[in-house]
């Protein structure tokens, strides 16, 4: 007898996103004089999941930042292949966060305290913050039993 198929809830996936410490971000390289564009670039990042978006910080001069400035389409996935969470969406340099968002980000980043990283609510006032907005998510904890796809409504920039 086959096992019944079940689905993950968004709360289960959101918990994984909130608790995860290692995220992988895959962007696409633009063309250069040395090489054609379209080559993937993957980098591990420390991220936080706040208000339905993934935030991470870094220099605008890094490879992934250069990539998203020309092509914002990005894939983000968590470390586990057994309890997979794979998101597709867009990333961009974030505006200065509001005081409320800065506080939420600072609180969320406390999960990295054991690694000596504890940014404060105003750490991104001068920039260096990126935001990833998911379009869809594929997740599973038991591949043949509960693969689940979520599709999100995208806010239009005004």
What are these regions (language model features)?
Residues 13, 64-67, 101-108:
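Amphipathic alpha-helical interface surfaces
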Residues 1-7, 83-158:
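Charged, gly/pro-rich active-site loop segments
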Residues 14-15, 46, 66, 120-122:
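Short secondary-structure boundary/capping segments
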Residues 10, 24, 46-49, 140, ...:
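Tryptophan-centered motif/residue detector
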Residues 2-24:
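Short, basic/aromatic recognition patches
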């Amino acid at each position: 007898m086959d096992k019944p198929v079940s689905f993950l809830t968004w709360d289960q996936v959101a918990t994984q996103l909130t608790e995860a410490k290692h995220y992988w971000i895959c962007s696409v390289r633009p063309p250069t004089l040395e090489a054609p564009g379209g080559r993937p670039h993957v980098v591990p990042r420390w991220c936080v999941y706040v208000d339905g978006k993934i935030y991470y910080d870094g220099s605008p001069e890094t490879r992934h930042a250069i990539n998203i400035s020309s092509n914002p389409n990005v894939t983000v996935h968590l470390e586990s292949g057994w309890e997979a969470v794979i998101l597709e969406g867009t990333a961009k340099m974030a505006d200065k966060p509001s005081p409320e968002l800065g506080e939420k980000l600072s609180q969320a980043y406390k999960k990295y305290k054991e690694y000596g990283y504890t940014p404060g609510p105003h750490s991104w006032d001068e920039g260096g913050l990126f935001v990833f907005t998911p379009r869809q998510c594929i997740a599973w904890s038991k591949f043949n039993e509960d693969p689940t796809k979520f599709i999100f409504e995208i806010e239009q920039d005004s």
